[in-house]
Curated annotation (Swiss-Prot):
Manganese or magnesium. Binds 1 divalent metal ion per monomer in the absence of substrate. May bind a second metal ion after substrate binding. Its cofactor is Mn(2+); Mg(2+). It catalyses: Endonucleolytic cleavage to 5'-phosphomonoester. HAMAP family: RNase_HII_B. Residues 11-200 form the RNase H type-2 domain. GO terms for cellular component: cytoplasm; ribonuclease H2 complex. Belongs to the RNase HII family. It is found in: Cytoplasm. This is Ribonuclease HII. Its EC number is 3.1.26.4. The gene is rnhB. GO terms for biological process: DNA replication, removal of RNA primer; mismatch repair. Its main location: cytoplasm. It comes from Hamiltonella defensa subsp. Acyrthosiphon pisum (strain 5AT).
Amino acid sequence: MTSDFIYPEAQSIAGVDEVGRGPLAGPVVTAAVILDPKNPIIGLADSKTLSKKKRMALYEEITHKALAWSLGRAESKEIDEINIFHATLLAMQRAVNALGIKTDHVLIDGHICPILSIPSSSIVKGDSKVPEISAASILAKVTRDREMEALDKVFPGYGFAQHKGYPTAFHLEKLALLGPTEQHRRSFRPVRRALISLTG
């Protein structure tokens, strides 16, 4: 990974990223990672640019080599209650608070930082610039993808294992035909529209 990003002065830095803001179903999942400079991981990149095989290999390496890592989440009902923006910030807070060791600075992918008790910075496209954020993006994506594949077995017919809850044509078709599950986000327009259509 090559980048002109300049790190803040800090002894311990955590990277944070999220996966799952756009889907119509399932949680938004976040991860926080503190890498070990003495035990580097080669090949870190934005999780969306990696093959599933490469993501899985890096997931195993990150969870074994990182000084600390943790996950956060906000469920569909929380997303409906406080909206996806605030739910994402809440999930990021949860991930940072769950880290087992102290960090001096948090680098967060995107434009806005959640309220934290430690200094933080938002980095636009941070998942392609900052290894710690890249690692967090990989952990969050692998975790959420696995959950959606498991959800596919609980609610067969929606294709969760394939589209992971995103609004593909197939998902929208099945949503209109079968109606929303308990994991669908009712505050999202396509889900609300399907619900109204089925209930009259």
